[in-house]
Amino acid sequence: MGEYKKYWIAVVAVLIIGFSILGYLGTDVYHQAPPVPTAYVSQDGQVLFTKEDILHGQSAWQSTGGQSVGTVLGHGAYQAPDWTADWLHKEVSVMLDIKSQEAFGVLYNQLGTAQQAAVKEVVKEEYLGSAVREDGTVVLSPERIAAMNATGRYFVELYGDNPDLTLTRDHFAMKDNTLPELQDRIDMARFFFWTTWMASTQRPGTDATYTNNWPHEPLLDHNPTPESVAWSVVSVIILLCGIGVVVWLWSFGKK
């Protein structure tokens, strides 16, 4: 035991330091967590769905395997896409078409470069400015509601048994009726929308979204913040340096 004492001391020190940092950052993450609005409402005050619906949808999604079958918030998955990124791209694509037809009478991809830039800027402003009001609700425009509903139908059918999506389910290694109950699928889609909302809405007092512009979405000019990139690079460097130090100490100790 005595010959390994210094190694045990090192292990204990690493655990104490590591869990102390983890606890501190975990507390900070808890306080900085994106809000779950009490409800999403239309401009005329109609309640579209509530916080309870979102939380029920989260539980419904987790019951299918959670992050084992697709992921949320850009975590990345071995099986199926990241649903936040997928939803965001699909919804923004629909939104751009709606706004283009309103302004110019044609779809977004039929516009010229200058017109596309103008439409994109309008959509970006709406998404970034979709803030929580003092009463805890978020107001959605008729166009955003239409885009949300169109996107939601795809996910409800994907997790159901729509034969048109059988091949897609095969590609994602999903079975028919992955989530059998219709209401569970509807609320799950609402949960996915909420993750998309936090990924595309500007955090008050900052120049980035609640998720630091992640997942990346070119249609909204969303790119990871410099801080996110810097910390990612630093963490990899620290990991490699740590491994190098351990190997060096082990080799030096044996000599």
Predicted regions and their residues:
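Hydrophobic core of alpha-helical transmembrane segments in multi-pass integral membrane proteins
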Residues: 16-20, 239-246
